[in-house]
Amino acid sequence: IGANPVLCRAMAYFHDVGKTSRPSMFIENQMAGDNPHDDLSPSISAAIIRSHVEDGLEMAKRHRLPQPIRDGIAEHHGTMRIGFFYGKALEQHGFAEGDPTLERQFRYPGPKPQSRETAILHLADAVEAIARTIGRGESDRLEESVGKAIEDRRADGQLDESDLTLRELSLIKESFLRSLCAIRHERVVYSVGESDETSSTEPDHDLEQLLPPPSSGTHPHGA
């Protein structure tokens, strides 16, 4: 789609560097049953989560990282809503969904992705997080969830300034699914009309199941 894959990879290495300022506040660094957000209000939790963007930009500036890397840090969440804590605020305080004041408190500062590379990073970050919650062998659910993550961000206007077309978003989705299925050791999932005769939604068999049995009288690991 005309994007720079090396730049995408470099941005991916640094996009969450701001989380190192307060690592225990982010779920990927928390031990089971130990979540400091349990004792905080939704608005304070959202402010802490949102701050990893500002903290990352400050680190990038201090260490003189190139501007494209800084762009990846700034734009990788766009202006997306911090959904979990937004939902808690609605539940606890009875706010009306879509309230402008609440929206400002529970959205990332942006800007929205301005390039193909930051748009890919934005989507990959969301898809990777969602894929962690889906068990191996749930290929149909994986395809549905990846598609929904991309569509939710498109519908929210997060990709409006990146110039990506619907066709390119479809190609990005297919690429994500191939990568995720490779990591999870599953076959690539194809939608109806896209499948080929070798595709399957079932996990690959173990290698030893695909090998012929050893000849009689021969040790399976050699002579």
Predicted regions span which residues?
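Divalent metal-dependent catalytic cores for phosphoryl transfer on phosphate-bearing substrates
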Residues: 1-156, 165
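Long, low-complexity, intrinsically disordered segments
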Residues: 203-223
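Cytosolic regulatory/linker segments at or just downstream of nucleotide-handling modules
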Residues: 153-181
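Generic N-terminal initiation segments characterized by hydrophobic and/or small/turn-forming residues
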Residues: 147, 166, 177, 204-208
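C-terminal amphipathic alpha-helical interaction region
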Residues: 190-197
